[in-house]
């Protein structure tokens, strides 16, 4: 048991404590909630199996080991919350907010179609982190109505979030 604790402590010390000054308390809490969702076995460390289970929970059951390995290699060691926050801090430094939001949606769009199923997005919004109320869901669908196939154009949502107006359809 002691070697495991020492390993975790060493991993925690590997992350920069400065990362906490990059975000306000609300943002840190949101990252903590995201970390908790991904840390499926609740051991305080995100590992390959946590990633696999998270993808499975989102309906993506055929994630290749190579994809998971590539994600794990983005960290220099075990991914505890400090390392997780540091990784996001580094990724967000100088990033365009539209690119960041689009990148978050792309995780949910493994085929790269630029759309997400309405039912899937709605389920995530009412069950994860800052849960949407039924009224908020209704308002969102009024602003961003899905197409006849039930697909939502998340690129338009990202544009409106960052620019305030709907993108002209060409």
Curated annotation (Swiss-Prot):
The modification Phosphothreonine is found at residues 26, 36, 102. GO terms for molecular function: calcium ion binding. Keywords: Calcium, Metal-binding, Methylation, Motor protein, Muscle protein, Myosin, Phosphoprotein, Repeat. InterPro entries: EF-hand-dom_pair, EF_Hand_1_Ca_BS, EF_hand_dom, Myosin_RLC. This chain binds calcium. Pfam families: EF-hand_6. It comes from the Eukaryota. Residues 26-61, 96-131, 132-167 form the EF-hand domain. Ca(2+) binds at residues 39, 41, 43, 50. Myosin is a hexamer of 2 heavy chains and 4 light chains. This is Myosin regulatory light chain 2, skeletal muscle isoform type 1. One of its GO terms (cellular component) is myosin complex.
């Amino acid at each position: 048991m002691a070697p495991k604790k020492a390993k975790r402590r060493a991993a925690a010390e590997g992350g920069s404590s400065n990362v906490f000054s990059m975000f306000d308390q609300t943002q840190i809490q949101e990252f903590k909630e995201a970390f908790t969702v991904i840390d499926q076995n609740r051991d305080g460390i995100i590992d390959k199996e946590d990633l696999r289970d998270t993808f499975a929970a989102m309906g993506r059951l055929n994630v290749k080991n190579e994809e998971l390995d590539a994600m794990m290699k983005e960290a220099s060691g075990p991914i505890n919350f400090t390392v997780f926050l540091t990784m996001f801090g580094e990724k967000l430094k100088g990033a365009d907010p539209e690119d960041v939001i689009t990148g978050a949606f792309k995780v949910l769009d493994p085929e790269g179609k630029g759309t997400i199923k309405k039912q899937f997005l709605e389920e995530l919004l009412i069950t994860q982190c800052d849960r949407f109320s039924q009224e908020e869901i209704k308002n969102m669908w009024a602003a961003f109505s899905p197409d006849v196939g039930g697909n939502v154009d998340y690129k338009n949502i990202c544009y409106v979030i960052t620019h305030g107006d709907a993108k002209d359809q060409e």
